[in-house]
Amino acid sequence: AAVLDDSDLHAEVAVPTHVAAQVDDAARERIRRAPYLMCEYLHAMGTGPAGAPGYAAQMSHPRHAGGFVWEWRDHALWRTLPDGRRALSYGGDFGEEVHDGNFVCDGLVDALSRPYAGTWAWVAAMAPDAPALARAIVEADSGSVGERDRLRALAETDLVPCADEADSPYALDESGRVARIGDMPVRIDLSVFRAPTDNDRGRGPVDYWGIDASNLGPLGVGRGEAGTSHAMRWEHARLHLLRRRLVSIEEGGGVRRVVERWAPPAAQFGVTLTWEYAPVRIGEEGPNALSVSLRVAPYGTWPPRVPRLGLRLELPGSAWHATWLGDTMIGYADMSVPGARGCGSGDACDLWDVCVRPQEGGHRQGLEALSLRGEAGEFLILPASPLGWSVSRWSERELAQASHWEDLPDLERLFLWLDVFQDGIGTRSCGPDTRPEVAGRMRDVDVRVVIAQVRGD
């Protein structure tokens, strides 16, 4: 729907508005001939905005006269914490009792003028030849030539069966869970939850929940029902409370097979995981490693979309440095920078998009190889099936429950997610939901990955 702005003496302009706007037939005919502006077609609150390519495709229409993303900058202010540190803050942090929220932190850049990951994705859709974008892509490809070549060689090296049980690259505990890789304690969990983004918490009317890709309307239509956010639906389904039950452990031919079931409490749906663990060597003279094959088989009726399907590894220590092959910039199914692939490098603590309120914001797609270096040596991840990844010192639940980064615990650990998929980001904080084409839908899938600890000298 649209209304006609006739305030200009020379040209009337059609301005799209809420789908429920009342427009008479005569005005509608004039609107169809007028130039049009897309007002607040995307909203830049939190992780995002996403979905820009769909709107960029509309801009070649001869009547199109421009559009606006809301908005340019986060409205956050410095606050001095009791320990003397300063933090960007909002709402009730300054005694505001009525409007305590981070909804004024909705900029393409933060309060210090630093672009968010979603901003680069938006630029890539709207102005792919922008010099600033070209510089950002080059800067993200920060790994050295030597690191690039080494990871490429590792990713392409054949695996050799490892028969030396005295130097096993892994151990399982009595319940069939991975207890260590190399001599490093490691915990692996299934994850189908993420810390809700501001868009996941959005309650606007452009909601695609339950709509599949075969029943799509035009951009910005959806269900037309406001009120319930994806975050509320995921919480109601208790996706953050998955529980594990061991089914069986078998061993034969050098392979250990573990079958387990995961489900939320009191749910009539869940997933059966079948793990196969085998010791291997990366090349004839390379390090010992663990080959992991995982079959994911959902049962029951899952929610129509889930935040993610992935593995969460917990590693000791927090001072890790990452080098990887794959997408070098943060991205999601509906929020990415085409061409930003190569060899990235950076401290693990710097690989998350830090919005004012903690939320999901560190996913990178298309992982080919990952090296994490810390006090315990090097931790290698070599995927043999499509995976995205992210790292954070905090779990999904800890991020979801925190209102500020300074509220999070200071613990010596690192979480590494290896994701089969994540739900799209969308822009539903004040705009359209994630489109069904990029929805996270639980499904049967096989995952294959090689994991190794390379001990330091």
Which functions belong to the PLM regions below?
Residues 1-158:
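Extended substrate-binding grooves/exosites of carbohydrate-active enzymes
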